[in-house]
A protein has these predicted regions:
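An intracellular "coupling" helix at the cytosolic face of ABC transporter transmembrane type-1 domains
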Residues: 14-21, 104-108, 124-133, 137, ...
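Alpha-helical segments in transporter systems
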Residues: 22-43, 47, 61, 65, ...
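Transmembrane helices of ABC transporter permease
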Residues: 19, 23-36, 68, 135-190, ...
Length: 360
């Protein structure tokens, strides 16, 4: 199996999105506006609270608050519809490409001992690519655009506040996912490969059930299946534990950066650089705007498995057929057929060893 970098896998998968670029652009626009509506729900509520304390009117802000709340639902629906439309259309396209490739590789590929691995690849590996197409491409762009807008908004109160916000977004949305990817290493690929081997083993057991029963090997076979299943469960548990750890780290970072924003804002207020309104609004804005970058942080774990699945599918598509199909037939004089040093063996048993043959 060829081990590609995650970047190469991403480029290969993104190449399929070209035909749906407009829908992807629509998902990004709807997502950005939707997240801004959700963020400013909290920010406007903070503004209203300040107006109440100062005994000032806030009717226009209340209307804006209601509008943001209503729009958020429609915008979120539109974004998800676009993302999943792209995902399921592309999954159908990928399945069509995979089955076309299997027809070229048949019968040699389908007659091998890794039939279960093929089943896992055609079904669950392709399904896992849905995470990439529906929950990766547009969320990355949405997080980038929303973060830039919020850095400008928070930085409007003071440059230092904007700098702290950019540090927070960068740490949670970029550094943590990179650490997750490095920490997980080949865990995702190993899990998907072992899952394919497990599926092959189970299918072989079903196909050879009569022989297994004939030689009274049923109990041993079941124990081996249990052993492989437990190994898969342990690998999955390691991945889930890693996900939980970094999700906890992300939540802690949100709290720490929000606290740091308030402390820095209060310090600037004591220095006379900003008003106290700026302290409250900048803190509220930061706390409310972590949604897009937290989504990226959580996504990093899922992408470990998704990239592994993408790598396996790309391996299949890159495989060359062992025998080329002759479409129009072949007419001609074959002459003498010669076989030189022909060998054939299974993993543990040699059948033919350097056979030489000449047929006139």
């Amino acid at each position: 199996m060829q081990k590609r970098s995650n970047l190469k896998v991403v480029i290969s998968l993104i190449a399929l999105v070209k035909s749906m670029l407009l829908i992807m652009l629509g998902a990004i626009i709807l997502g950005v506006i939707g997240y801004l509506a959700a963020i400013f729900l909290t920010v406007i509520a903070g503004e209203i609270m300040i107006k109440v304390i100062k005994h000032e009117t806030f009717t226009s802000l209340l209307y804006l608050l209601i509008a943001c709340g209503i729009l958020r639902g429609f915008l979120r629906y539109g974004e998800q519809w676009c993302n999943h439309f792209i995902a399921f259309k592309l999954l159908a396209m990928i399945r069509d490409i995979v089955f076309a490739k299997l027809r070229k590789l048949a019968p040699a590929k389908l007659d091998g001992k890794d039939q279960g691995n093929l089943v896992a690849m055609i079904t669950s590996d392709v399904e896992l690519l849905e995470v990439f197409y529906a929950h990766t491409i547009s969320p990355v762009m949405i997080a980038l655009i929303v973060s830039i807008i919020m850095i400008i908004y928070i930085g409007y109160y003071h440059f230092a506040l904007g700098l702290l916000a950019s540090t927070a977004y960068l740490f949670i949305g970029v550094i943590i996912p990179l650490i997750v990817g490095k920490k997980s290493g080949n865990m995702g690929l190993n899990y998907r490969n072992d899952y394919g081997k497990y599926t092959s083993y189970v299918l072989e057991s079903v196909h050879g059930l009569r022989i297994i029963d004939q030689f009274s090997r049923g109990n041993k076979r079941l124990k081996e299946i249990d052993k492989k299943s437990e190994l898969l469960n342990e690998q999955n548990k390691e991945l889930k534990d890693l996900e939980g750890q970094y999700r906890m780290i992300g939540d802690i970072c949100v709290s720490l950066f929000s606290l740091a924003m308030f402390i820095l804002g209060y310090y600037l207020y004591r220095q006379g650089s900003i008003e106290f309104n700026g302290v409250l609004i900048s803190t509220i804005a930061l706390m409310a705007s972590f949604g897009p970058v937290l989504a990226l942080s959580s996504l990093a774990h899922n992408l470990v498995i998704t990239f592994a699945s993408g790598n396996r599918v790309l391996d299949l598509l890159a495989e060359e057929p062992q025998v080329e199909t002759v479409i129009n037939g072949y007419q001609g004089n074959l002459g003498t057929i010669e076989i030189n040093n022909l060998s054939f063996k299974y993993e543990a048993e040699t059948i033919l060893d350097k056979i030489n043959l000449s047929i006139d």
